[in-house]
Amino acid sequence: MMATTEQHPTLERATFKHSVNILIVVAPYYKDIAEQLVEGAKAEIEASGATWEVTDVPGALEVPTAIAIAHCHTNFDGYVALGCVIRGETTHYDTVCNDSSRALQLLGLQGVCLGNGILTVENSSQAEARADVDGQNKGGGAAAAALHLIKLKQKWSKPTGKIGFLSQVENKLV
């Protein structure tokens, strides 16, 4: 089955007043695909004025674990998960796709700003179409998602202007 070229609406590119640093975590099992995904992610991050660092992990199942470790022990503002899983002859494909996606979603629900660019496809042609920087550019899309979540987190994390003492009467910040 061919990948469609249908266009979807996109949000305006996120930009930042202060420095933003992104960790790109990539499973380079399919090296050519991974390189395209990383290229797209780097370009989007740089276009937003942010900086990036790349780290490799053995496979798609290790991507969420690496992000969780980095989130606990570093000061990255957000994360981009990249990799590719192509269906094979066994059910391993389903396990890797479902578990990596679920783990990334759980991280997001805990407030980790991340974009999921782990491709889950039937064949290499689909992967190439989605990874191509001049095509569907899913690496760039995953980076854009992470950047938008960082922007949203910054918006909702603004100081209220109050000094932080609790009123004993109302039990509210004053």
Task: Describe each model-derived feature in a short phrase.
Residues 28-29, 57-60, 84-85, 118-124:
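Short, ordered loop/turn segments at secondary-structure junctions
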Residues 55-81, 87-91, 95, 105-110:
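N-terminal small/polar loop signature for handling phosphorylated ligands or for N-terminal nucleophile
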Residues 136-169:
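A charged, well-structured terminal subsegment
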Residues 122-136, 167:
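Phosphate-binding/catalytic loops
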Residues 31, 46-50, 68-72, 105, ...:
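Generic secondary-structure signature for well-ordered alpha-helical cores
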Residues 11-57:
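Glycine-rich phosphate/diphosphate-binding loop of Rossmann-like nucleotide-binding domains
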Residues 1-21, 158-174:
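SAM-dependent methyltransferases
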Residues 94-121, 125:
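Short, acidic/small-residue loops that bind anionic groups at enzyme active sites
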